[in-house]
Amino acid sequence: MNRAYGKMLGVGRALGGRVVTNRDLEAVLDTSDEWISTRTGIRERRFVAEGQSCVTLAVEAARRALEHAGVPGASVDLVVCATSTNPESMPSVACLVGEAVGAAGVGAMDLSAACAGFAYAASVAGAMLASGLASRVLLVGADEMTSIVNVRDRSTGILFGDGAGAVVLDRGDGSSGFVDHILGADGRMAPLGRAGHPGDGKRPLYQNGREIFRFAVRMFPEMVEKIMARNGISLDEVQYIIPHQANARIIQAAARKLEVPEEKLVVNVDRFGNTSAASIPLSYPDIFDGLEPGKYIITVGFGFGLTWAANLYRI
């Protein structure tokens, strides 16, 4: 059995304070609740409230994860944050999170890989723990998508939300944690999705939804099958698959290809919308208490770049 590094000690999440339903969007966009829910599976999403930002969401999620783990921030020796919406070019969100939770002075870095960001960051955290360069990592995925999306654009404004998720990872004894990772990117497909800097209203997020849908429906099952095959496990040994929450139709189409039972798929896009790098860790609080030791979790991310990544975690 391969050794595993990055045992989950605790998880936490934070959401934008404004609940925006499909009915709310009907008032400002040429759309309907039925049109949105049928095509995306989204019923509502969260937008930041006054005083909230990508940074405040990341800090709140991190604090909750540490509290859930029952460990102080000072016990962490590395903070890694996946985000594409830091409101400032520098300092990093991770630096601000570390200072806020009492982990100032330790390593801290942001990682940007769009909606695949958390899966990428998990591979970095796992590698740092496996190498011994870190013994306890605070791993965060946070995005304020409303800072880069034109919320009055019917094609994109209906899709995205704001949130953050965090997990405390311990090096552990090698029995539980990340076992394997897949990383990939193809810059030739960069024109399929772009966005300007947060707050830059002149360059709001654009995506070729049709082509990205095709890419995701192909890549999602390919990564799941590949990471299972090279580690010699079957779907029966997988308790959960947590995909990036881009669109319920993508998840459903990929699940049909894999012939995955519905109960193995973790879905929150209906409640939170597409929260980019936050979407995978936002799922952890919903499943943490029922995790079965010895089973596996597969996380799958895909996003602009185009980027893709998968992680195999042994519970």
From Swiss-Prot:
Molecular function terms in GO for this entry?
A: 3-oxoacyl-[acyl-carrier-protein] synthase activity; beta-ketoacyl-acyl-carrier-protein synthase III activity
Q: Where is this region: ACP-binding?
A: 245-249
Q: Where is the active site?
A: C115, H244, N274
Quote the Gene3D superfamilies the UniProt record gives. 3.40.47.10
Cell location: Cytoplasm
HAMAP family the record matches: FabH (MF_01815)
Name of the protein in question: Beta-ketoacyl-[acyl-carrier-protein] synthase III
